[in-house]
A protein has these predicted regions:
Chain A
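Composition-driven recognition of glycine/serine/threonine/acidic- and proline-rich low-complexity segments
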Residues: 2-26, 30-211
Length: 211, 162
């Protein structure tokens, strides 16, 4: 069955939001255990956007960000991005590595990431994303296999182009479920963006008996 | 201060005389900057994919290298640009993540976008006079309609003018 975003009703979007909540809740718990820190999250939002508008929803295309990206496949397929501002990413890495945090520098500070920091962030992203996908998998009964995580620090638009190009092959719009996490009292902010591919929506909704 | 016109992903626009066309954060996508110095008509396309063939949903011409160039040329010619004077500068086509796994279909999409862009420009007889492509980093570009210069900004890889 072919599915287009225009056919998604309010009920369908609510279901996707609920699934996002379950996934994000599980991800927040795992991260909190790993870092021994309090994690706050907002209620996930489901957004549908044209490609040329997506940057204005997530921030300017040339904003410097750190991101962990992975793809998942199995009964449903898609892309996940975990995006942080660079200062939060630096602090998150030092939290895991037990190194000294940098509280002096400004948000726009850029000094690149060491291989060790990059790999720490890949691992944090991996744990977050896997817990998220695990929860969705148990809830829907669908098998989901995540790929290896990849780290990059660059312009938001450039990082987003990777999952969006995949979308571009089937659609002019993209649907994503976005959750924001706040880590500890240091107010490290991050966006967690899940973009299932277009065929996966009907599979998810069917598995829950919604369509 | 010059007026700045933003071109989004899978989008294209043209201006004439003065002003700046910009597209922010090009990753694997390619920015195609066309310019006719005699009439000062400037056009910028931000393409995502090499080819519209074999893709069912292909009505957004700005999304594909093979269809965006033709559409941008039409718009520019409506603004009195003269095709024989139009030249091209291209930027982007990076590979943002170094995939270690099995050959993904996304592998080298940046490179394929660049090749398809050059091929399409050749078919339209538009010479590519400058190019800043490849690598593993993003680019923000600005095309100045006043002089046709293309400013390429990166994070950590310098700024250049093409």
């Amino acid at each position: 069955m072919h599915f287009s975003f225009d056919e998604l009703s309010g009920l369908h979007l609510d279901v996707l939001k609920e699934i996002g909540t379950i996934g994000a809740g599980n991800a927040a718990t795992s991260l909190s255990k790993l870092l021994v820190k309090r994690i706050d999250m907002n209620v996930p939002e489901v957004k549908i956007s044209e490609f040329n508008m997506i940057e204005s929803i997530l921030g300017s295309g040339d904003t410097l960000v750190a991101g962990v990206y992975l793809q998942f496949e199995g009964e449903i397929k898609g892309n996940v991005l975990f995006i942080l501002d660079t200062k939060s990413a630096k602090n998150l890495a030092s939290l895991l590595l037990g190194t000294k945090q940098d509280n002096e520098s400004k948000d726009e500070f850029y000094a690149g990431f060491s291989e060790l920091e990059a790999s720490a962030l890949e691992e944090i992203g991996n744990i977050l994303i896997s817990s998220y996908l695990n929860a969705i998998s148990s809830f829907t009964g669908l098998s989901i296999k995540p790929s290896v995580p990849y780290f990059a620090c660059d312009m938001l638009g450039a990082i987003l182009s990777v999952p969006l190009i995949q979308y571009g092959q089937t659609s002019d719009k993209v649907l994503f479920v976005e959750t924001d996490f706040e880590i500890g009292h240091d107010k490290m902010k991050s966006h967690f963006i899940v973009m299932p591919d277009i065929k996966s929506f009907s599979i998810i909704l069917k598995s829950l008996g919604v369509i | 201060m010059d007026e700045v016109v933003k071109v989004g992903m899978a989008d294209l626009k043209a201006i004439a005389g003065s002003g700046i066309l910009t597209t922010l954060g090009l990753g694997s996508c390619v920015g195609i900057a066309l310019y006719d110095r005699t009439t000062k008509v400037a056009g910028l396309a931000h393409i995502m994919l090499p080819s519209s063939k074999h893709i069912r949903n292909n009505h957004n011409k700005a999304k594909f290298a093979d269809t965006a160039v033709g559409q941008l040329l039409e718009i520019m010619m409506d603004m009195k640009a003269r095709k024989e004077y139009i030249t091209a500068k291209i930027a982007g086509g990076a590979q943002m993540f170094s995939f270690k796994e099995k050959a993904s279909e996304l592998l080298n999409i940046g490179e394929r976008n660049v090749l398809a862009t050059i091929e399409t420009l050749k078919q339209h007889n538009i010479p590519v006079i400058a190019q800043d492509t490849g690598g593993n980093y993003g680019r923000t570009i600005e095309l100045n309609a006043n002089n046709g210069l293309l400013l390429v900004k990166t994070i950590g890889h310098g700024i250049k003018t093409l």
